[in-house]
Amino acid sequence: MSRIGKRPIPVPAGVTVAIDGSAVTVKGPKGELSRVLPADIVVSQEGAELLVKRPSDEERHKALHGLTRTLVANMVEGVTTGFKRVLEITGVGYKAEIKPYGALLSLGFSHQIEYKAPQGVQITAPNPTTVVIEGASKEHVGQVAAEIRSLRKPEPYKGKGVKYQGEVVRRKAGKAGGK
């Protein structure tokens, strides 16, 4: 049995879980998330815990068992505490401004880039070189962070660009300025 899949998912107080066939909806203080899970995998609620069960030991069911448990656990965590990604902007003149629709990014191009945040994701900038992305869905928060980072990935010579907080950019030596 999957080691991850067989662990029960604790449901904290203030979170309600509705299971309708293969659809699971989780409501909590940070919002509401719903997802249609694979039809073979069964999610059941017993008291303040959710259990994920698989019908057989087929390879496909084993793979889906742990995945489904992790997806549901992320939904529960998202509606209780939420998820957060922090991006750092490095470079002369590189900055981010928060607008009502999302973010206005100056990343060294001849124009500024407008990034529209999807619904359920909040973008804030505590200072012009830091962007904080928060939301209930781990997928959406990670996708928005990846899209903003892809606008100007950190380059290896000077390290300019957008990177995740704590990301290490491998630096390269420039041209050897010898004779």
UniProtKB/Swiss-Prot annotation:
Disulphide-bridged cysteine pairs: none
An annotated Gene Ontology molecular function: rRNA binding
Keyword Membrane: no
UniProt xrefs under SUPFAM superfamilies: Ribosomal protein L6
Domain of life per record: Bacteria
Example of a GO cellular component annotation carried by this entry: cytosolic large ribosomal subunit
GO biological process: cytoplasmic translation
Keyword terms: Ribonucleoprotein, Ribosomal protein, RNA-binding, rRNA-binding
InterPro entries: Ribosomal_uL6-like, Ribosomal_uL6-like_a/b-dom_sf, Ribosomal_uL6_a/b-dom, Ribosomal_uL6_bac-type, Ribosomal_uL6_CS
Family: Belongs to the universal ribosomal protein uL6 family.
Matching NCBIfam families: L6_bact (TIGR03654)
Quaternary data: Part of the 50S ribosomal subunit.
Its biological purpose: This protein binds to the 23S rRNA, and is important in its secondary structure. It is located near the subunit interface in the base of the L7/L12 stalk, and near the tRNA binding site of the peptidyltransferase center.
Protein name stated in the entry: Large ribosomal subunit protein uL6
